[in-house]
Amino acid sequence: MKPYDLPDARGHFGPYGGVFVAETLMHALDELRAAYDQCRVDPSFIDEFNYELKHFVGRPSPVYHASRWSQRLGGAQIWFKREDLNHTGAHKVNNCIGQALLARRMGKPRVIAETGAGQHGVATATVAARYGMECVVFMGSEDVRRQASNVYRMKLLGATVVPVDSGSRTLKDALNEAMRDWVTNIENTFYIIGTVAGPDPYPRMVRDFQTVIGQECLTQMPEVIGRQPDYVVAAVGGGSNAMGIFHPYIPYENVRLIGVEAAGEGMETGRHAASLAAGQIGVLHGNRTYVMQNADGQVQETHSVSAGLDYPGVGPEHAWLKDSGRAEYAGITDDEALAAFHDCCRIEGIMPALESAHAIAQAVKMAPALSKDKVILVNLSGRGDKDMHTVAERAGLQL
């Protein structure tokens, strides 16, 4: 096993990461970094976090053998890590609990968040209700349209949802607005970022709160198959569910890590969100990473059927894992993801989120070419209730 200790003291993963923000945010980030570095080694904080994961979220989430599908494909065995079974229906809540507990310790009564698919917004609104905090969620107006049921869920949980009409009206624009709010209300507000992006300490902090996924797998897989899997596959937008399952496996060199980006309508069309495959190195939302840019270096509009993957950047640790060769990254199109969504419903009785369907589609592509003793572990990062309207629309149905 190879030791792995990134980021460095300045929040860099090789040339990626770091802190690229306005001077007005530096004090808030220094304060956050100090609080997080203290809490992450504080036994009482760790105990409280683990208690909430068990009793509020319902962890550990199980691993499940997709046996009928594996048999049909006739190759490798596919297993799912069932993050869809968490309270609120996705992996997002793991991180939200960690950051909300941190906000409470820092004496910040108001939390804000950005959201794309709405899952992070719902998870943030949920923990804000749990701890009696004021909550404001920024969401691109295009995503508000795509994810109407999640918008209503957030409102039911007591959150204020602010639609963002600038730019492409999606996740990156919501993130920009949330950053502006944070600068304005820095004294009483904690910004709960939903993915492994943003300025340090966010990429490592979100990763650390999500590594519970992979840590559970390290224990669970030997219990069910007698060893670790050969492949670990996860969808990558910003990349938090993938980092959560990848990170504990990084030292296991015989386990191949495969991230799956949104190839949208096809890589050749330019209508996709695969920043690792097609982006250039740039700075976005406070960190250096791969960014979808046009010839002038402006952030390019992205496309994916999945709102949660529709982001023009990617977490800096993924950029480093790609360059170092420790992880590989593939692309799955809208059509391939939708086919996997339908097949998963019919064959396994599980309705995955469209984000997770990208990872499942990649596993289904790989399995037939591999021998039956190989094992692919897929992070089924969320459930698909939120995507009913999108899937129905694509099938020409009106719900």
UniProtKB/Swiss-Prot annotation:
The modification N6-(pyridoxal phosphate)lysine is found at residue 92. It catalyses: (1S,2R)-1-C-(indol-3-yl)glycerol 3-phosphate + L-serine = D-glyceraldehyde 3-phosphate + L-tryptophan + H2O. It holds the Pfam family PALP. GO terms for molecular function: tryptophan synthase activity. One of its GO terms (cellular component) is cytoplasm. SUPFAM superfamilies: Tryptophan synthase beta subunit-like PLP-dependent enzymes. It is an enzyme of class 4 (lyase). Tetramer of two alpha and two beta chains. Belongs to the TrpB family. This is Tryptophan synthase beta chain. The gene is trpB.
